[in-house]
């Protein structure tokens, strides 16, 4: 199986203000990377999301940069791809920032392909599910227009529905 195409798409949508305790988030944002293969199998990865305050149109040029390094490679060689694209290019692009986020999306897309090729979910490839996990919910913060009733409802929902 070989990579034939790497696509980059940017999505943005309006949503009600969501407060994280530090500031209100703006619109929803997502950068999606799709990796396609010569066998018709494809994988998707993404970055951006709730805290993506930077303009997402800066992500596609990084995908363009990595595309020529990916086409023709075996997408199931996730470790080799991570080493070649991340570790070998760290001197050019640096150890963090946009390139790291794009590499994460590419890596997730390749893991998605690997899982599909082996008939397993990505979580199974990474060791399976746990019967219990610790959780954390932030909330109960003041926001303009939020009274005690709304605060109580938020906390009630978090305890009853989220745990």
Please describe what each predicted stretch is.
Residues 111, 127, 138-140:
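Beta-hairpin (beta-strand-turn-beta-strand) motif
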Residues 1-51:
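Structured beta-strand/loop patches that form or line metal/cofactor-binding pockets in enzymes
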Residues 16, 96, 139:
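Catalytic cores of transferase enzymes with a strong primary signal for eukaryotic protein kinases
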